[in-house]
Regions:
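Paired small-residue
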Residues: 6, 77-84, 92-101, 290-298
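Helix-breaking motifs and short loop linkers at transmembrane-helix boundaries and internal kinks
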Residues: 34, 66, 87-93, 232, ...
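Conserved MFS/SLC helix-loop-helix module at the cytosolic interface between two early adjacent transmembrane helices
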Residues: 53-92
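Helix-to-loop junctions at the C-terminal end of transmembrane segments
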Residues: 55-67, 252-264, 348-349
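Cytoplasmic helix-loop-helix junction between adjacent transmembrane helices
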Residues: 97-136
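C-terminal membrane-cytosol helix-exit motif in multi-pass small-molecule transporters
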Residues: 164-184, 371-375
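C-terminal transmembrane helical hairpin of 12-TM major facilitator-type secondary transporters
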Residues: 266-310
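A late C-terminal transmembrane helix in Major Facilitator Superfamily
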Residues: 317-354, 361
Length: 404
C-alpha cells in the first residue's frame, strides 16, 4: 500500500481524537466555564452540526480544486478550530470553535477516500479506504484515552492544543506524501458532483448508512449505564472497556476492507446481519462481566465491518461525483449518531430497561439491512433493463416473409 495512506490516517487520527474526546472532558469543561453539564453537552452537538453542514458544503465548494490542496486546506481549518477551542474565553466562543472544528471532518474523509482509492489497483480500493479509517479507530484505542487523561491532569485546554499539534503533523505528512494532482481539478466539477446526488441508488446507500450506524449509536450512546447497571462494572472500568470497543472497531474496519475487495455486497449484508445479531444478544450478554466485555468488542467489529463497503458503495453509485457523495456519506454518519442516540433514549424513557437501546438498535440495523436489500433489487432491475436494451440493439432484423 502507498505510504501516502499514512498521511490520511494521521489526519483521521486527529479528527477521531477531537470528535470523541469532548465526551470525556465535559465535567472539566463545565466546571471551568461555570455551566451545567447539559449545557456543556451542546459542545458535542456543535461539532456534529459542523460535520453535517461542512461535509457537503466544503466538498461542493472545493470541487474544482486540486484534491491534495483541498486536504491540506481542510487540515489547516481543523488546526484553527482546535487552537481556537483551546483559547476560547467562554462557552459561546467554545461552541463556535467546536462548530468550526467539525466543518472539515466530513469533507476530509470524503475527499480522502477518493484520493486513497485513486492510488491503488481496483482490487485494493476498499482496503485503501479501511487504512485511512484506521486512524479513526486507533484514535478510540489510544488517542481519546490519552487526550482525556491529558485534559484531566493539565486542563482541558491542553487537550485541544495537543490535537492542534497532531493536525500540524498531518499537514506536513499530506504535503510530503500525497502526490500532486496533475489536473487542476476533477473533470466533473461542481455540476457533475451535484448531478451524482440525484441518483436513487446513492440515496439508498446513504439511507443504509443512517440506519446501520444509527443502530450502533443507539447502543453505544448508552453503553456506560449498560456496563455499570447491567453487567456490574465499576465506573472506573468503563474507559478500559471503551478502548476494547476501539480494538473491535479496528478489527472490523480492517476485516471489512479486505472482504469488500473480494465481495463488497455480501460483506455489507453480512456486516449488517451480524450487527442485528449482536445487538439482539445484548440483553443476554450484559448479565455478566465477561459477557459485557464480549458485547462491547463484538459491537465494534460488527459495526465497522460495514464502514468500507458503505463508503465504496456510495462512491461507485456516484462515480461522476465521488467527492461530494463520499462527503455526504460522512454527514450521514453524523445524522446516524444523533438519530441513533435519540432512538435509544426513547427506548430508555419508555421504561423498557437499561439494555433497551441495544434492542432498538437491532431494529435499526434490520431496517438498514432492508434498505440495502431494496438497493440490491433496484440495481438488479436496472441491470436487467440495460441488458435488455443491449440485446435488442444487437438483434438482427428478420427478413420479411414472402406471401404467395
Amino acid at each position: 500500500m502507498p505510504l501516502a495512506l499514512l498521511a490520511l490516517a494521521v489526519g483521521a487520527f486527529g479528527i477521531g481524537t477531537t470528535e470523541f474526546v469532548m465526551m470525556g472532558l465535559l465535567p472539566d469543561v463545565a466546571d471551568d466555564l461555570g455551566i451545567s453539564l447539559p449545557a456543556a453537552g451542546h459542545l458535542v452537538s456543535a461539532y456534529a452540526l459542523g460535520v453535517v453542514i461542512g461535509a457537503p458544503l466544503l466538498a461542493a465548494a472545493t470541487a474544482r480544486m486540486s484534491r491534495r490542496t483541498v486536504l491540506i486546506s481542510l487540515m489547516v481549518l481543523f488546526v484553527a478550530g482546535n487552537a481556537l477551542s483551546a483559547l476560547a474565553p467562554g462557552n459561546d466562543s467554545l461552541l463556535a470553535a467546536r462548530f468550526l472544528s467539525g466543518l472539515p471532518h466530513g469533507a476530509f474523509f470524503g475527499v480522502g477516500a477518493v484520493v486513497a482509492t485513486n492510488m491503488v489497483a481496483p482490487e485494493r480500493k476498499a482496503r485503501s479506504v479501511s487504512l485511512m479509517f484506521l486512524g479513526l479507530t486507533v484514535a478510540n484505542i489510544a488517542g481519546v484515552p490519552v487526550a482525556t487523561l491529558m485534559g484531566q491532569r493539565l486542563g482541558w485546554r491542553a487537550t485541544f492544543l495537543g490535537v492542534s499539534v497532531i493536525g500540524l503533523v498531518a499537514i506536513a505528512s499530506l504535503a510530503l506524501l500525497i502526490p500532486r494532482d496533475r489536473a487542476a481539478a476533477p473533470t466533473t466539477g461542481l455540476r457533475g458532483e451535484l448531478a451524482a446526488l440525484r441518483s436513487l441508488p446513492v440515496w439508498l446507500a446513504l439511507g443504509t448508512t443512517v440506519a446501520g450506524f444509527g443502530a450502533l449509536f443507539s447502543a453505544y450512546s448508552y453503553i456506560t449505564p449498560m456496563l455499570t447497571d447491567a453487567a456490574g462494572y465499576a465506573d472506573s472500568s468503563v474507559t478500559l472497556l471503551l478502548a476494547l470497543f476501539g480494538v473491535g472497531a479496528t478489527i472490523g474496519n480492517l476485516l471489512g476492507g479486505r472482504l469488500a475487495d473480494h465481495a463488497m455486497r455480501p460483506t455489507l449484508f453480512g456486516g449488517l446481519a451480524s450487527l442485528v445479531a449482536v445487538l439482539a444478544l445484548f440483553p443476554l450478554l450484559m448479565t455478566t462481566v465477561w459477557g459485557g466485555a464480549l458485547a462491547v468488542l463484538l459491537l465494534g467489529v460488527a459495526a465497522f465491518v460495514t464502514g468500507s463497503p458503505l463508503t465504496m458503495t456510495v462512491m461507485e453509485k456516484a462515480a461522476a461525483g465521488p467527492s461530494l457523495a463520499s462527503s455526504a456519506n460522512q454527514a450521514a454518519f453524523n445524522l446516524a449518531n444523533a438519530g441513533g442516540a435519540w432512538t435509544g433514549g426513547l427506548a430508555l424513557a419508555a421504561g423498557f430497561g437499561v439494555t433497551s437501546p441495544a434492542s432498538a438498535g437491532a431494529v435499526l440495523a434490520a431496517l438498514g439491512l432492508g434498505v440495502a436489500g431494496v438497493a440490491y433489487a433496484v440495481d438488479r432491475r436496472r441491470e436487467s433493463a440495460r441488458a435488455g436494451h443491449v440485446v435488442a440493439a444487437h438483434t438482427p432484423e428478420r427478413p420479411g416473409v414472402l406471401h404467395r
